[in-house]
Curated annotation (Swiss-Prot):
Gene: dnaK
Compositional bias per record (Low complexity), positions renumbered to this chain: 599-610
Keyword Nuclease among UniProt keywords: no
Function: Acts as a chaperone.
Organism of derivation: Rickettsia peacockii (strain Rustic)
Pfam families hit by this protein: HSP70
Residues bearing the modification Phosphothreonine: 197
Highest taxon listed in the record's lineage: Bacteria
Residue ranges, annotated region (Disordered): 598-627
InterPro entries: ATPase_NBD, Chaperone_DnaK, Heat_shock_70_CS, HSP70_C_sf, HSP70_peptide-bd_sf, Hsp_70_fam
Induction behaviour: By stress conditions e.g. heat shock.
Protein name: Chaperone protein DnaK
Biased composition (Basic and acidic residues): 612-627
Family: Belongs to the heat shock protein 70 family.
Keywords attached to this entry: ATP-binding, Chaperone, Nucleotide-binding, Phosphoprotein, Stress response
Length: 627
């Protein structure tokens, strides 16, 4: 079994790590950064990922996709999707299956596809470091992700060419990294406030056993919401001062978003910052500039309710685990937003203790995923991870009631069966509708999917016995079966959301991704060949000018001919031809090298003679009489 990489697929940034010896290690990307922006852009038929996509966002906002994790596994009519539509500059569209997709460069992409592009970048980063192919990964998700979101994340891995060995909850991964190679037994809380989601998990750690007791959270609360508050504040201030509403100017909005994120980060360490955006817009009187002094106190006032929203899930998680705040021995902070002093203050106030800041909040989740990868390929031993399902699972029964089969915070993997019957006389088929959530009526919960069990022998209602079995695997993904005990007829399914990607769609996306990877590789080879050729042309022309007179007319003619041939193909798209002409010029240029060496050899004795002459010093001597 080869190396298993751990990937933190984040809303704002992503990170990849691997076990190196007995320690997990974060891998730097090609730009030398330890995290990569979770941003994809399409420009002139080219796909950009990470920092390169982020750099051009201002001028290409319609085709720059970010925070897609907030859309993954969601239906287009989801209220959270509607909320996002009013914030992001790119188009969110309704897919044929009812899911929320994004539109860029006149193409539609599923959130799983966009996520796959980011995962491909993480995969390439690991392969460049390891010098070997990577095919297996552990990918993290928010603990409060439902089945559809987990399945969509797994699909993203498959599209990226990865076998996803395990989907692991982000707080659990953080706890793994925190408790790795620590022998002390502790009850900890992991408070994870990232770019787009919030999770809190309560765990007991003892002798290498990491047992999650409960989890809670909000999959639509994170740093993006903090940025939006600052952005709206800047729009309001500018409107009051200049009478111009920037909310309808996409270019200005993108600049404001970047400025808001930058100011938020600066105010984690400073108490005041200046937001200066020259030429933000213009009217009949000329260009307008935005220059606003922004304080930490103003920021805290703007986002106070968002921070407060994280406290109720903490309270519920403690209650579900059967603990009081005073029972928690350590609070581990995860996610970039936990650098904000006001967030740390709120955590300290609720748990009654100073939070632990000994882990890097941007990297700890990827490190934990790498450790879990090490467990799965036997590199790491003596660790047992017991995670839980975040939401209750059940089916719709008579009257639209939600009947739970598996309660939230049940340790996974788990399996539970219950016998149901028909609601009508002579009913030959039943539809099993599977829901996930905590409300008492099925319609108020998340419909994960449905399937039919047919061929039930005709009988009065209430007589047939239909056994429904829920099986949740270690990834938190749901498998359901229904069996008529009289006839033995059985129907088994891995729940696929009412939307979701079909197997055929996933396979097509895998092929597209492989094709794009080949095209990207060919494009890179072409650029590298052109760069090498261009460099050779420049150096040859320079040396030809300096030493051309040292060559015979035949040799000089051969070099000039090869030089002209290479220059003629520099603008072509034929990599092989450019390489061929480059090799020809390299061979012809050997004659220049010989001429250069000969010229330097001839000048060296004269130079040495001159140097020796310089060492001879004529001196006048004068006798000095002693007095």
């Amino acid at each position: 079994m080869g190396k298993v990489i751990g990937i933190d697929l984040g809303t704002t940034n992503s990170c990849v790590a691997v076990m190196e010896g007995k320690e997990p290690k974060v891998i730097e990307n090609a730009e030398g950064e330890r995290t990569t922006p979770s941003i994809i852009a399409f420009a002139n038929g080219e796909k950009l990922v990470g920092q390169s996509a982020k750099r051009q966002a201002v001028t290409n906002h319609r085709n720059t996709i970010y925070a897609v994790k907030r859309l993954i596994g969601r239906n287009f009519i989801d209220p959270m999707v509607k909320k996002d539509q009013g914030i992001v500059p790119y188009n969110i569209v309704k897919a044929d299956n009812g899911d929320a997709w994004v539109e860029a460069d006149n193409n539609k992409y599923s959130p799983s596809q966009i996520s796959a592009f980011i995962l491909q970048k993480m995969k390439e980063t690991a392969e460049n470091y390891l010098g070997d192919k990577v095919t297996q990964a552990v990918i993290t998700v928010p603990a409060y992700f439902n089945d559809a979101q987990r399945q969509a994340t797994k699909d993203a891995g498959k599209i990226a060419g990865l076998e996803v060995l395990r989907i692991i909850n982000e707080p659990t991964a953080a706890a793994l990294a925190y408790g790795f190679e620590k022998s002390a037994s502790k009850t900890i809380a992991v408070y994870d406030l990232g770019g787009g989601t919030f999770d809190v998990s309560i765990l007991e750690i003892a002798d290498g056993v990491f047992e999650v007791k409960s989890t809670n959270g909000d999959t639509f609360l994170g740093g993006e919401d903090f940025d939006t508050r600052i952005l709206n504040h800047l729009i309001d201030v500018f409107k009051k001062e200049n009478g111009i509403d920037l909310s309808n100017d996409p270019l200005a909005l993108q600049r404001l978003k970047e400025a808001a994120e930058k100011a938020k980060k600066e105010l984690s360490s400073a108490v005041t910052t200046n937001i200066n955006l020259p030429y933000i817009t213009a009217d009949s009187s000329g260009p307008k500039h935005l220059n606003i002094k922004f304080t930490r106190a103003e920021l805290e006032k703007l986002v106070d309710d968002l921070i407060e929203k994280t406290i109720e899930p903490c309270r519920k998680a403690l209650q579900d685990a059967g603990f009081k705040a005073s029972d928690i021995q350590e609070v581990v902070l995860v996610g970039g937003m936990t650098r904000m002093p006001k967030v740390q203050e709120a955590v300290k106030k609720f748990f009654g203790r100073e939070p632990h800041k000994g882990v890097n909040p941007d990297e700890v989740v990827a490190l934990g995923a790498a450790i879990q990868g090490g467990v799965l390929n036997k590199e790491v031993t003596d660790i047992l991870l017991l995670d839980v399902t975040p939401l209750s699972l059940g089916i719709e029964t008579l009257g639209g009631v939600f009947t739970r089969l598996i309660d939230r915070n049940t340790t996974i993997p788990t399996k539970k069966s219950q016998v149901f019957s028909t609601a009508d006389d002579n009913q030959h088929a039943v539809t099993i509708r599977v829901f996930q959530g905590e409300r008492e009526m099925a319609k108020d919960n998340k419909l994960l999917g449905q399937f039919n069990l047919e061929g039930i022998p005709l009988a009065p209602r209430g007589l047939p016995q239909i056994e429904v079995t829920f099986d949740i695997d270690a990834n938190g993904i749901v498998h359901v079966s229904a069996k008529d005990k009289a006839s033995g007829k059985e129907q088994k399914v891995t729940i696929q959301a009412s939307g979701g990607l079909s197997d055929a769609e996933i396979e097509q996306m895998v092929k597209d991704a492989e094709q794009n990877a080949d095209e990207d590789k060919k494009r890179k080879e072409l650029i590298e060949a052109k760069n090498a050729a261009d460099s050779l042309v420049y150096s040859t022309e320079k040396t030809l000018t300096e030493y051309g007179d040292k060559l015979s007319s035949d040799d000089k003619g051969a070099v000039e001919e090869a030089l002209a041939a290479l220059k003629a193909v520099l603008e072509s798209e034929d990599t092989a031809l450019i390489k061929e002409k480059t090799e020809s010029l390299t061979a012809a240029s050997m004659k220049i090298g010989e001429a250069m060496y000969k010229a330097q050899s001839e000048s060296q004795p004269a130079a040495e003679s001159a140097a020796n002459d310089e060492k001879i010093v004529d001196a006048d001597f004068q006798d000095v009489e002693k007095k």
